[in-house]
From Swiss-Prot:
Cytoplasmic side: 1-18
UniProt protein name: Glucose N-acetyltransferase 1
Gene that encodes it: GNT1
Location (main, coarse): Golgi
Species of the source: Candida albicans (strain SC5314 / ATCC MYA-2876)
Lumenal side of membrane: 36-462
Compartment list: Golgi apparatus membrane; Vacuole membrane
Family that this chain belongs to: Belongs to the GNT1 family.
GO molecular function: glycosyltransferase activity
CDD domains from the UniProt entry: GT8_GNT1
Any GO CC annotation of this UniProt entry: vacuolar membrane
Function: N-acetylglucosaminyltransferase involved in the Golgi-specific modification of N-linked glycans.
Amino acid sequence: MTSKSSSWKALLKNWEFKVAAFIGIYFLISHVVLETTDVVNEKGLKSHLKVLPEEVIDYYGKQPFSNVDKYAYMQYATNYDYLNLAIINFIHLRKANTKIPNLVIIYDEVLHYYASDKWSELYQVANQYKITLKAAPLIKASYQDDSNWAASFTKFHIFNQVEYDRIVFFDSDSMLVDIPNEIDFDNMESRFNHIDELFKIPQELSFASPQAYWLNNVVEGKSPRPRKNVEIPNKKRYSLRMKKLVNDLSIYQDFNLLPSLIYENHYFDNANHFFANHIMVITPSKNTFQELMRYIHNPWWWSITNRGSLRKPNDYDMEILNKYLNNELQRKRINVGILPHRVYGVLTGEFGEEWHERFVVEPQYLPFINKKSNKGWSPLEFFKKIKVVHFSDSPIPKPWEEENNEEHYNIKKIYCDKGDMEKFHKDYPVYKPRLTDDCDSVSIWNWFREQFYKERSGYWFA
């Protein structure tokens, strides 16, 4: 007995034994007890991640509302410009006769102290259109961080608004549009439009947003391409499939009938940036809000138990939300929908790109396309589909920011090669936009900005 006891004491003093014991305990806790993101389990993703095609959302949009009192549109603002933008967007919704009574802007609580004149004007306009301004503390990972995205975590307050059953959120640097069938860029204005149909997607989906199609590792060649060949259906075949799907949904009312991703690594190879979050449909939950706060302000024990979810210095709202969704999907604790990006997730910068097939295809077919391809691209056709457009053209300034035609960022703009060349050289004496024969895309890009100036007329105080 004494010999065994002394052997055990000697073993405890052995550093190699201590290291091995620590590794064993760490593995047990992290991989068995806590199920961290280091374990990738592909089984079951198809049951929890669903594609919401345009035709399906159109079908849901035609269904009657049950009770809109518990629904809300939301935006957030951390400065006066974005508060003003949010108010303009909600004025648009009111003029579009949205059925949703609650239009709520979450704003940084210090805004009504800094510039009283601006605040007073903005508050009066918001009150006139029955827009609720709700103060909330700024959320930042570090108050030493002064980057453009440092305060973007503030948008996560929307998850804590549990007085509502469903929220449709969009960033305030977006614009709602309804494009006329007859295109005349010189004399055309958008009609007023809402996106009430998003409140009607299946209740089983507690989160939905478009795919960040512009950040796909497979298309960029950073992740292996699928081994199997998948034929992307032409318009006619795809239309027939959608008609059958809508018919089946009308009969069975089962969200499991919705399409899934064809290639599961399409998600797993892009898990940190798969979902865009400039527009979201969410089910508020205090648990979700508290969990997101942990993803921003990591508990000390995550360094041991949840290393895959630790926030990196350049992780902001989009990256953090994707980490959270990745964990929830792998643990099969959430049902998520992929909204059609060509309707709700459009970036203005798309019309300045050289290649467009990644925008053209349905989300499930993205891994099977070529990066440098314009197959299926018809700018006017896609222009007419858009309901929400997000001003995103970095490094080109936003339309409410000051521009200078002599700055380097002008090389990121586009100019019709059939346009006025004398004006081209006069307007851009140093850094010149890229000349393109896609003149419709040039007209569309310019029209978005001109439409914004019309939208803000009479309501711009910032």
